């Protein structure tokens, strides 16, 4: 969770994913209460899914999931992407 608006965190998430791999798709939609953006990509042949959800006008929740090419999750790289997003948000 980041105390920044959705658009700012979305741009930081794109930069973080581009640092380690490639973005393959992005989308935006609204739920009943929140605006949501998603990113999908590849990092070291692992699939990445990011959900960036504005929970309030000034707070955003980011969920990162990674699946390795052999099927297991890659928690280390998912955590590294979360940390990179935080670094991208640092002034």
Annotate the PLM regions.
Residues 1-91:
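Ser/Thr-rich, low-complexity intrinsically disordered terminal regions
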């Amino acid at each position: 969770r980041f105390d920044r608006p959705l658009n700012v965190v979305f741009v930081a998430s794109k930069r973080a994913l581009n640092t380690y791999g490639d973005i393959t798709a992005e989308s935006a939609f609204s739920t009943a209460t929140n605006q949501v953006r998603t990113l999908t990509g590849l990092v070291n042949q692992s699939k990445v899914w990011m959900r960036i959800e504005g929970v309030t006008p000034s707070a955003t929740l980011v969920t990162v999931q990674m699946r390795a090419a052999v099927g297991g999750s890659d928690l280390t790289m998912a955590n590294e992407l979360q940390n990179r997003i935080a670094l991208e948000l640092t002034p």
